[in-house]
């Protein structure tokens, strides 16, 4: 309820929380609610009895809907992410897909974004009725939990448990398998008939 009030009523882009390193219960509660560990503030608090404590810092970013005015930023993020992770794509393929993503794929899905503390889009996800159609994270923002937060939102809030992944995108495949997805099928080509095999994944029952 507190998170919903902060994000929905106050329109906060980020909610932070601190706890002591020895307070394992608080850490578990924060992680269970989607908070991401950011780092430790050393000697952050001087108590009344003279003890000095560290603080572990956590944050949870808001998930918002972009507008059409955000599409140019989204396509720039898409290209940076693809060049960082889709090494199997040729330059010709990237230039082929770029206008399709901008003009056809983005308007065709329900888009969700996460902005960083500077207001820039750090990651975005596109959903259809039954499938996670796309997930892209800016290379500078990878490893911060943005992708995981978006996927957990798709699973818990939208009840979507399927995703397609390029077979040659090992990083994405490992990411989804770590979250509990398993391979249930394979196509030799992508949706445009290009020679990039696609793996069909679904969340295992014990992870739903």
Model-found features: residue ranges?
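Conserved beta-hairpin
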Residues: 110-123
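Conserved GNAT acetyl-CoA-binding A-motif
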Residues: 8-18, 156-168
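A short beta-loop-alpha structural element at the N-terminal edge
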Residues: 60-76
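Acyl-donor (CoA/ACP) binding surface of acyl/acetyltransferases
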Residues: 1-62, 205-207
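Conserved active-site alpha-helix within GNAT-family acetyltransferase domains
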Residues: 22-39, 148-149, 169-186, 192-194
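Conserved acetyl-CoA pyrophosphate-binding loop and the N-cap/start of the following alpha-helix
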Residues: 1-2, 141, 145-153
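Conserved GNAT-fold acetyl-CoA-binding loop/helix
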Residues: 76-102
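Conserved catalytic-core motifs of GNAT/GCN5-like acyltransferases
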Residues: 16-18, 36-51, 164-166, 182-199
